[in-house]
Amino acid sequence: MPVITLPDGSKREFAHAVSTLDVAADIGPGLAKACIAGRVNGELKDACDLIETDAELSIITAKDEEGVEILRHSCAHLLGHAIKQMWPETKMAIGPVIDNGFYYDIDLEHKLTQDDIDALEKRMLQLAKTNYDVVKRVVSWQEARDAFAARGEDYKIAILDENISKDATPALYHHEEYTDMCRGPHVPNMRFCQHFKLMSIAGAYWRGNSENKMLQRIYGTAWADKKALSTHLTRLEEAAKRDHRKIGKQLDLYHMQEEAPGMVFWHNDGWSIFLELERFIRRKLNQYTYQEVKGPLMMDRVLWERSGHWDKYSEAMFTTSSENREYAIKPMNCPGHVQIFNQGLKSYRDLPLRMAEFGCCHRNEPSGSLHGLMRVRGFTQDDAHIFCTDSQVQEEVSACIQMVYDTYATFGFENIVVKLSTRPEKRIGDDAMWDRAEEALKQALRDNNIEFTILPGEGAFYGPKIEFTLHDCLDRAWQCGTVQLDYALPSRLGATYVAEDNSRQTPVMIHRAILGSLERFLGILIEEYAGRFPTWLAPMQVVVMNITDKQADYVEEVVKFFKEQGIRASFDLRNEKIGFKIREHTLRRVPYLLVVGDQEMENKEVAVRTRDGIDLGKMRLEDFATKIHQQISLRSLKLLEE
């Protein structure tokens, strides 16, 4: 007689084993109709799974984030169902949930076209509208293998052979004549999967290994209702307009090419923004009392073995050899910073020692994962490492948090989600050390009035971590900042200091990044601002245009004056109509467009308008320069107004 405890504390007693769906029906028909799955004693279960003992139960519906994720997973199976009806010879690989949607990798000789995708989507909707039940069967490993062998599903067989224990009991989900294998849970009926869209096709290697066969990957998105789907598609349209790759080309900021995959060729205007970001962070480093250092790009393999990176990251490291020695190009800066710390005897009086670097790092990311500035192989980290004592951790972490929030606010990011990853099952150190470390991070967050969620067991083996994820104007999440405690690396690389009692102690190391990769953060900014950078970041802040050749000398004089004032200015003396010039520089997103005619030349003035088309009237050069300087010094996100 299981007793089911609901989230509000109420209890319901049943005479026999019940499913989540049974409990929902006992509460009311509306909830039964909305029930997608259940969380039983903290674990997600299919709505039809039986609960045989006393349990705590949360009923999952499409209003829950977990419910939407489940229906997305079921939409992947629905896609598989439609594919096998249209191309029975297809071999199905994997179909997981991803952010806002799902995909399925398939092995099909026929190369899919957009017309095929449209037809697939139509078939999926036809199937979903029949409202068929999804039937779950838990079988033995051998039964599952036999079922897929009979269907010629080689990839499912490979998953069973390579990833699933023969003692396991896999779950098979039957969508009428189509069968798929999954941990689940899935929707009990396809009426929940009515609001989806297939988005694109791409190539993907089986297992992500370029030595394996190239499969076709079909991406889709799915939502709980029509309105949510429509909102998402509208947001995607806006995101496409803001795509940093497209805007980067339009504004001549950078390019990438096949001969250097994942490496950025910065053009003048893009490099100007990059350097401005560096200058801004450098001022922050000075404000928070950091040393700035520069480590070598390449170090001997022996050092990477001592640090532990060779065992964990060697596949992602670029290597080379010279004079019978093997070297690795650094994928991160931390081992180099420990080497700098180790030069000369350090005392407890020298701590905390804050060491920062704009480190040029390289990681051999899979070619299929490269994506403009967002995923590259060569990147610059605004990386820092703080060497401190145990008692200094909380104060130092608190300062890191303040630095992160100060920085993000400057760029207009105010919606920051914070997560604290705590001790994993496999870890170094005793529980007392982890208790102190985790409490120090929690208290630092509390001291700054930061709300955070805890990710149990998600910390690194060498220490807990805080992650900062910013949300942009399209509510997309970008994980950028991290504060990570490290109790392992200083010890591995022999870092010590002389304590107050003259004993040798190992410092705690705090890894700290704010922007993360400058390349990626610049990509985020391009999309956040749609290329309309605030004045302080804009590569060209002012363009001065003449109406006739008569004003050419004065225009050059004006630009010279602005440049002497430290304002990034250029002129446009082309023999074109002024309306044409204004439109062209508006498309280039230059913040201020200055027009000079006879009257402005005579009065030593400029007619000022913004890229938004706002006419600010005529101003004396000194007055305009003063206003711009004020904007730049305040790092204002807005342009001057009337």
UniProtKB/Swiss-Prot annotation:
GO biological process, one term: threonyl-tRNA aminoacylation
Keywords per UniProt: Aminoacyl-tRNA synthetase, ATP-binding, Cytoplasm, Ligase, Metal-binding, Nucleotide-binding, Protein biosynthesis, RNA-binding, tRNA-binding, Zinc
Domain named TGS: residues: 1-61
Family annotation (Gene3D superfamilies): 3.10.20.30, 3.30.54.20, Anticodon-binding domain (3.40.50.800), Bira Bifunctional Protein, Domain 2 (3.30.930.10), Threonyl-trna Synthetase, Chain A, domain 2 (3.30.980.10)
Catalytic reaction annotation: tRNA(Thr) + L-threonine + ATP = L-threonyl-tRNA(Thr) + AMP + diphosphate + H(+)
A GO cellular component annotation in the UniProt record: cytosol
Cofactor(s) recorded in Swiss-Prot or TrEMBL: Zn(2+)
EC number: 6.1.1.3
Source species, domain of life: Bacteria
Self-association and partners: Homodimer.
Function: Catalyzes the attachment of threonine to tRNA(Thr) in a two-step reaction: L-threonine is first activated by ATP to form Thr-AMP and then transferred to the acceptor end of tRNA(Thr). Also edits incorrectly charged L-seryl-tRNA(Thr).
The name this protein goes by in its record: Threonine--tRNA ligase
Organism, as annotated: Shewanella baltica (strain OS195)
Gene name for this UniProt entry: thrS
